[in-house]
Design a protein with these regions (language model features):
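Conserved AdoMet
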Residues: 32-86
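Non-catalytic accessory regions of SAM-dependent methyltransferases
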Residues: 1-34, 40-42, 46-49
């Protein structure tokens, strides 16, 4: 599965659980999963994910769908276009 499709599916899962900003959250969790920034995610959306990364991504999506904050899941606090480590 490629990055774009995984993000879309993750966003749909979050949206169905009424999580606000589901697309952004899905992108941030993907970036955390593959240890890249959002710019890389957007520019390389057709790259294929390995099974380990895909499973880790869906674990984060599941935790987010249960209400865990993105900052807690990523250990980063995102503020506009930059972040700081907690």
């Amino acid at each position: 599965m490629n990055i774009n499709l995984a993000i879309s599916q993750g966003s749909k899962i979050l949206r169905n659980k009424f999580i606000p900003n589901s697309q952004l959250d899905s992108e941030i969790l993907m970036a955390k999963t593959i240890n890249k920034d959002r710019k890389y995610i957007l520019l390389n959306s057709n790259n294929i994910l390995n099974n380990n990364d895909l499973n880790n991504f869906y674990e984060l999506i599941e935790k987010r769908s249960l209400g865990n904050p993105v900052a807690y899941l990523t250990n980063k606090k995102f503020l506009w276009n930059w972040y700081r480590h907690k």
